[in-house]
Regions:
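Conduit-forming functional cores of very large proteins
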Residues: 1-710
Length: 710
C-alpha cells in the first residue's frame, strides 16, 4: 500500500500507525528512512474487494424501500422520486417539512441514490440477506453501514473494488456462530473457509461497516452487546512480521527491522533454481526449519522454503571481537557447512541483425577489431566464442566473444570502404569471480540468437558478512575462531555463534532470550515449539522441560575457556536461536585500486566498485591527517594520487596561461607572449574551479611570489 504523498515532507499524521489500521495494515512492516509509514503492507488475513456491478445492487435497494432521487422505472415498476414528490407537494402547498424528517440518505459507492424512512432497519435487512446467502454470488462483496451522529443520518453501501476488508466471526445474541463442529469439519476438509463465509458464520467487514461493529478480542470477552469476534489476533501482522517468535516481548522498532531483514535472508527461493536464469540470486546450502515457530509459519509455507539455520548461541563478551554488534563464529562449524551459500550472476547477450544485411557475430574476436582487450581476456573462449560450463572465471574474463558493426564510421574508413568492427564481448564484472554454472543458447522473440551464461560463486562466511536473528539483532562477523579455542559447556558443546551481552539491555529484545530457552527446550523435547505472539506455550512449561533434562531453568550453563581450559566465572546464557544469513556479504562490497579510470570532468578517480573506483578521503579523514601533521601524506593523497596537474601562471597578472602550438610557446591571456609563466603543480579540480569562476566574470589571480623566491 503505497501513499502518493511527497517523501521529503514530514506528514506525521500520514506516517503514524492509526487505530483504524488494526487488522488491515501490518503494524511493523514498513521501510526505514524517507518511506517510513508511507509504504505499508497488508495484514495476514485481509481480503481486497474485487467489486461487483452496482446496477443490480441499486435495484435491490429500491426494492427494499429506498426512494430514488427522481422518478424512475425499476424492474417494470415506476418509483416516485424523492425530489419529484417534494416539488409536487410544494406546488400544491401541502409541504409541511415533517414528511421526510428522520429519513436516511442512502449512498451507493459514494453516490447519493435516494432516501429511506428507516436506515437502521434497511441495514439490518441487508445484513440478514447477506448472511443467509440470499443476495447471490456477490453477497460477500457487499458491505453496509448506518452512520447516525448528530445531524448526520446516512446509510453507506459499498460494493466497489479496492476496499481492504478483514474476516470476523459473527456474534448473535452474545454467542459466536463459529462452533467446535465447524472447526472439526474444517480440519477434516468437509468445509472450507469460503463455505463459512457463505453460511454467514464469518463475514468480511470494510472500514465503513466496522464503524457499526463491537468486536471482542477473545471468546471469553463476548457479551450480549458484541456483534463480532476476532478470528485470530496474530492475524494483525503481515507475512514477514508473522515469522517473529515472541514478537510481543520485543521493542516495536526491533520487529520493524526484522520485517525488513527477513526479505534479505538467504534460503531456497525456488525448487527449480537449477533451471532458472534469474539476473542474480542466492542459495543457502543447508536451510533448516526453525525449532521455535509461529502458527503463521505453517500458513505461509515458510517450513517448505526456510531461510536460516538453528545456531547454538552463547551470550558472552569472550575475546572482545564481538563488540558493537559484531559476532564471533565457530570456524569449525563454518568448515562443516554452517551458513554456506552460493551466489548466481547472469550474463546475457544477443546477436542482433541490422538494416543493410549486417549483423553481430558471436566468435573469438581477432586482434584487428576496435577495442580488443588483449589475448589474456579471451583465453577461456572455445571455438564457438562461448566459454564452457564449469570453467573458473574472474573479473575481466570474456564469457561470450562478440563483434559488432561500429556505431560511427570514420572519414578514412568511409573513403577506403573498409569498416573496422568493434568488440562488444560480455565479460565477468570487475571484482567478481566464480565458475560457469550453465550456458543457455536460444532465440529471442525476433529470432535473434540469445546467449545466457550463469556464473556461480561459493560464499563461505568470512569477516564482515552480515547475520541477523529474527528479533532485529543484526551483526557482522568479527572473528572466526577454531573449535578448540571456543568456550565449551560441561557436556562439550561449543557455540556456533557468540553474541555480546551489551546487544540486549538498551534494545529490549527479550524475545530472543525467550527463543534461546525455547530452542533448547525444543531440541531436548524433539519437536518444534509454538511461540506465536499472544498464544505461545507457557514459559513455565519450558523451564520444566529444561529442569527435567538436568539444565538450569534460566537457560544458563557453566562454561570453560577453550584456550586455557579454566572454568569461566559466572554462568553463561546459551541456547538455540534461529539465525539468518543476509545478502550483504563483504565479497560483494570490498574493493581497492592502485590505478584505474578517472572522471572526464574532474580527472579524479571514479567512485564505486563496479567502475573500478577508489576510496574517497572525506573531510574527517583529511582532518585526521592535518591533526597528525602528516603534510607529505596529505599532499600525496589529495594531489599526487588523485588529480595532479601542472598549470603555468603569469608572474605579472596571476592568470593561467596556455600553450600556443603554432608559436611553440606559452602565452598569457593578458600579457600575451611577453609574459613570464611559471609552472605550478595543483589539483585539477582546483584548476577547474578557477576556470569556472572566470566563466562567471570573476577574476581569480594566483600569486606565485613564494615559488619565485624558492
Amino acid at each position: 500500500v503505497v501513499s502518493p504523498l511527497a517523501r521529503g515532507q514530514p506528514h506525521f499524521e500520514a506516517r503514524e500507525l492509526h487505530g483504524t489500521q488494526w487488522g488491515r495494515i501490518c503494524p511493523f512492516e514498513t521501510p526505514e528512512g524517507a518511506n517510513i509509514g508511507l509504504v505499508k503492507n497488508l495484514a495476514l488475513l485481509v481480503n481486497v474487494s474485487v467489486g461487483v456491478d452496482d446496477k443490480q445492487v441499486e435495484e435491490l435497494l429500491y426494492e427494499l424501500g429506498v426512494a430514488p432521487m427522481v422518478t424512475k422505472k425499476v424492474r417494470g415498476k415506476v418509483l416516485k422520486g424523492y425530489l419529484d414528490d417534494i416539488i409536487e407537494k410544494l406546488d400544491r402547498g401541502e409541504l409541511t417539512g415533517e414528511e421526510y424528517r428522520g429519513w436516511s440518505r442512502v449512498f451507493l459507492n459514494g453516490k447519493l441514490i435516494g432516501y429511506h424512512p428507516d436506515g437502521e432497519q434497511l441495514v439490518k435487512t441487508l445484513r440478514t440477506l447477506r448472511r443467509r446467502g440470499k443476495l447471490g454470488p456477490w453477497a460477500s462483496e457487499l458491505n453496509v453501514a448506518h452512520i447516525k451522529q448528530g445531524p448526520i443520518n446516512e446509510v453507506i453501501v459499498n460494493t466497489d473494488a479496492g476496499r481492504i476488508r478483514r474476516p470476523l466471526i459473527v456474534v448473535e445474541n452474545g454467542v459466536p456462530k463459529l462452533t467446535k463442529e465447524h472447526v472439526e469439519k474444517l480440519k477434516k476438509g468437509e468445509l472450507t473457509f469460503e463455505d463459512l463465509v457463505k453460511m454467514g458464520v464469518i463475514e468480511y467487514l470494510d472500514p465503513d461497516e466496522e464503524e457499526n461493529a463491537y468486536i471482542a478480542l477473545t471468546p471469553d470477552q463476548v457479551g450480549p452487546e458484541h456483534t463480532h469476534l476476532e478470528l485470530w489476533i496474530p492475524g494483525i501482522f503481515g507475512i514477514t512480521a508473522s515469522i517473529i517468535p515472541y514478537a510481543e516481548h520485543n521493542q516495536s522498532p526491533r520487529n520493524m527491522y526484522e520485517a525488513a531483514m527477513a526479505k534479505q535472508a538467504l534460503g531456497l527461493n525456488a525448487a527449480n533454481f537449477q533451471r532458472r536464469v534469474d539476473t542474480r540470486g542466492h542459495l543457502l546450502h543447508y536451510p533448516q526449519k526453525p525449532l521455535v515457530v509461529t502458527r503463521a509459519i505453517e500458513v505461509i509455507g515458510y517450513n517448505e522454503r526456510p531461510a536460516g539455520q538453528n545456531f547454538v548461541v552463547a551470550v558472552l563478551t569472550s575475546t572482545g571481537y564481538n563488540i558493537e554488534d559484531a559476532v564471533v563464529l565457530n570456524k569449525s562449524s563454518v568448515d562443516r557447512g554452517l551458513a554456506r551459500s552460493t551466489f548466481f550472476r547472469l550474463y546475457t547477450t544477443t546477436e542482433y541483425k541490422y538494416p543493410g544485411g549486417i549483423q553481430d557475430e558471436i566468435t573469438r574476436p581477432p586482434p584487428s577489431v576496435r577495442g580488443y582487450r588483449g589475448q589474456r581476456a579471451y583465453e577461456l573462449l572455445e571455438d564457438d566464442g562461448i566459454v564452457a560450463p564449469e570453467t573458473p572465471v574472474q573479473g575481466g574474463d570474456v564469457l561470450v566473444g562478440k563483434i559488432s558493426p561500429p556505431r560511427f564510421i570514420s572519414a578514412q574508413e568511409y573513403a577506403v570502404g573498409g569498416v573496422t568492427r568493434q568488440d562488444t564481448s560480455i565479460a565477468v564484472r570487475h571484482g567478481e569471480k566464480g565458475v560457469v554454472d550453465m550456458v543457455l543458447i536460444t532465440m529471442d522473440d525476433e529470432g535473434n540468437k540469445l546467449i545466457k551464461v550463469r556464473v556461480r560463486d561459493l560464499r563461505i562466511p568470512e569477516l564482515g558478512d552480515k547475520f541477523a536473528s529474527r528479533h532485529g539483532q543484526k551483526g557482522v562477523v568479527g572473528l572466526l575462531v577454531p573449535q578448540y579455542d571456543m568456550p565449551f559447556t560441561e557436556e562439550g558443546i561449543t557455540p556456533d555463534l557468540i553474541i555480546n551481552p551489551h546487544a540486549f539491555p538498551s534494545r529490549m529484545t527479550v524475545g530472543q532470550l525467550l527463543e534461546s530457552i525455547a530452542g533448547k527446550a525444543a531440541a531436548l523435547r524433539g519437536e518444534s515449539l509454538d511461540a506465536t505472539p499472544f498464544y505461545k506455550e507457557s514459559i513455565e512449561n519450558l523451564k520444566l522441560v529444561l529442569k527435567r533434562h538436568g539444565y538450569l531453568p534460566t537457560g544458563e550453563e557453566p562454561m570453560y575457556d577453550g584456550r586455557a581450559g579454566e572454568l569461566l566465572k559466572g554462568l553463561v546464557f546459551i541456547g538455540l536461536v534461529y539465525y539468518q544469513k543476509l545478502h550483504h556479504m563483504v565479497s560483494d562490497k570490498m574493493h581497492a585500486r592502485a590505478r584505474g579510470p578517472v572522471q572526464i570532468l574532474t580527472r579524479q578517480p571514479t567512485q564505486g566498485r563496479s567502475r573500478a573506483g577508489g576510496l574517497r578521503w572525506g573531510e574527517m579523514e583529511v582532518d585526521c591527517l592535518v591533526g597528525h601533521g602528516a603534510s607529505l601524506l596529505l599532499r600525496e593523497t589529495m594531489r599526487e594520487r588523485s588529480d595532479l596537474t601542472r598549470i603555468y601562471v603569469c608572474e605579472e597578472c596571476g592568470f593561467i596561461g596556455y600553450y600556443d602550438k603554432n608559436k611553440g610557446k606559452l602565452i598569457c591571456p593578458i600579457h600575451k607572449d611577453k609574459a613570464v609563466l611559471k609552472p605550478v603543480d595543483v589539483s585539477y579540480a582546483f584548476k577547474l574551479l578557477i576556470q569556472e569562476l572566470m566563466s562567471m566574470g570573476i577574476k581569480p589571480r594566483l600569486i606565485v611570489e613564494d615559488i619565485l623566491k624558492r
